[in-house]
A protein has these predicted regions:
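The feature marks the mature, well-folded catalytic cores of soluble enzymes
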Residues: 39-459
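N-terminal chloroplast transit peptides
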Residues: 1-29, 39
């Protein structure tokens, strides 16, 4: 018998310098420069991003209202885009999170898959399509990082703004169009551009992301530099940075230590500093003066433990540099860790403690939060396979195509052994239940075909 477990609670933060290669980075022009300047009036240094966004709410051309339309929710489930109430995942939940088939026992976690912010954003897209049936609808990015969901929106007639060399082409968008801002938000530059064009803006930004924006706004009002724990090329971090006056993006604790060594005059020269962070800071950034007072925020999908460690590191650095009595003048902290991200990272802890033989991570290949779930498994030295759809599992040949947390695509033959083993399975916050169900069915099908082949070979 094969036992499958779906995750429950674990704490860990990981240093990603162990990766031999990194994910291929998109050639994004960071910050505000990816907006066609001719399409919108320029943003000055005294521009108030948070105030501007709040002001949009007073117009009749902007909404972030979630209607919670039951018809939209029902359609999402029927089309395999939302939570499952009748499918395999729902059945597993009803049976005390356990299910057995083909000699395979599945144990389901209490926190995995679609988070509230993601479900809300996708449902708002369905609601917008229903509310504006005859209008052309555009979205500034993928609504979430999941191919199944984005494909379905495309089938519904939602158009995606195209991007070339980091520059988005808004030219096809007409003033009478509806434009959706995705779950991880949009830069204030894009919001202003769209408002100046006169389009109807449907803002599906997750409230947890908005909370981070409020945090960097407070940094700016105190004239502090925002240290953003994130990936500088990630859409959410680009949006967050646009709400900051001065910012620096660090991707991990290693880069944070590099910055703190510089603050304490133990590190590199200014020239070396600027070279290392050339794509990850605000225009005109000067590490000599701009690292005198800092606040820490994060991309909501980053590792909770690592964000906390980075915050503590900067706190200790500022105490050492300026003295404990002056800490408040040089360091500002707010809790911007996303509860859903934390729950899903915690949800893998118990599973790792139970030492499963294999882990399956289900989620979009460009999903940051899913990559961290894969990373946690890899660091625990558990064979872990990250797949975005069930199509990655070849049930005929017992082969799986999967991705590492570092971005490498790999293929493994005979990945599912015939012997008894324990397999853990969880999924990222952008993954619908139906995608997980399809992966489980592919595993069951692989096991059934393995039994047939074994029987034939023994004749």
């Amino acid at each position: 018998m094969v036992t499958f477990l779906m995750a429950s609670p674990f704490t860990h933060f990981i240093l990603r310098n162990r990766c031999t290669s990194r994910m291929k980075k998109r050639a994004l022009v960071h910050g505000r420069s990816n907006i066609p300047a001719q399409a919108s009036s320029p943003i000055g240094k005294d521009f108030d991003p948070r105030g501007y966004r709040r002001g949009l709410g007073a117009t009749n051309k902007y909404t972030r209202k979630f209607l919670n339309d039951p018809d939209a929710k029902r359609r999402m489930e029927d089309e395999g885009i939302g939570y499952s109430t009748t499918g395999l995942v729902a059945q597993i939940k009803e049976k005390n999170f356990a299910h057995t088939k083909e000699g395979v026992t599945i144990k389901l976690a209490d926190s995995y898959g679609f988070c509230w912010g993601v479900e809300r954003a996708v449902q708002m897209c369905y609601e917008a399509r229903k509310q504006y049936p005859t209008k052309e609808i555009w979205i500034t990015n993928e609504i979430i990082h999941n191919p199944t969901v984005n494909m379905r929106l495309s089938e519904m007639g939602v158009n995606f703004i195209q991007e070339t060399d980091g520059v988005k082409n808004f030219n096809p968008v007409k003033s009478e169009s509806v434009v959706i801002l995705p779950a991880f938000g949009a830069s204030i530059d894009e919001m202003k551009l769209l408002a100046d064009m006169g389009v109807m803006i449907v803002d599906t930004t997750c409230p947890w992301v908005s909370r981070v924006w409020n945090s960097v706004d407070r940094h700016a009002r105190k004239q502090f530099t925002s240290i953003i724990h994130g990936k500088f090329e990630h859409e959410e971090t680009i949006a967050t940075a646009s709400f900051a006056k001065t910012y620096l993006v660090v991707k991990d604790i290693k880069e944070a230590r590099w910055v703190c060594d510089y603050i304490l005059n133990r590190g590199a020269t200014k020239t070396e500093f600027m070279r290392k962070f050339k794509n990850a800071h605000s225009d005109g950034f000067d590490p000599v003066k701009d690292l005198d007072a800092v606040g820490v925020a994060n991309q909501t999908t980053m590792l909770k433990g690592e964000t906390e460690a980075i915050g503590k590191l900067f706190e200790r650095t500022m105490m050492e540099k300026h003295g404990v009595q002056n800490l408040g003048k040089h360091y500002f902290v707010t809790n911007t860790i996303c509860g859903a991200t934390q729950e899903r990272q915690d949800a893998i802890r118990k599973l790792i403690d139970e030492k499963p033989d294999i882990m399956i991570i289900v989620g979009g290949f460009n999903s940051s939060n899913t990559s961290h779930l894969q990373e946690i498994s890899e660091v625990a030295s558990i064979p872990s396979y990250w797949v975005d759809t069930a199509d990655r599992i070849d049930t005929e040949s017992n082969r799986i195509s999967w991705k590492t947390s570092c971005g490498e695509m790999r293929e493994t033959e005979n990945w599912l052994p015939q012997d008894s083993l324990t397999v853990g399975i969880t999924s990222g916050a952008s993954t619908p239940d139906k995608v997980v169900e399809n992966v489980l069915e592919a595993i069951f099908k692989s096991r059934a075909k393995m039994k047939v082949r074994c029987t034939i070979n023994n004749l």
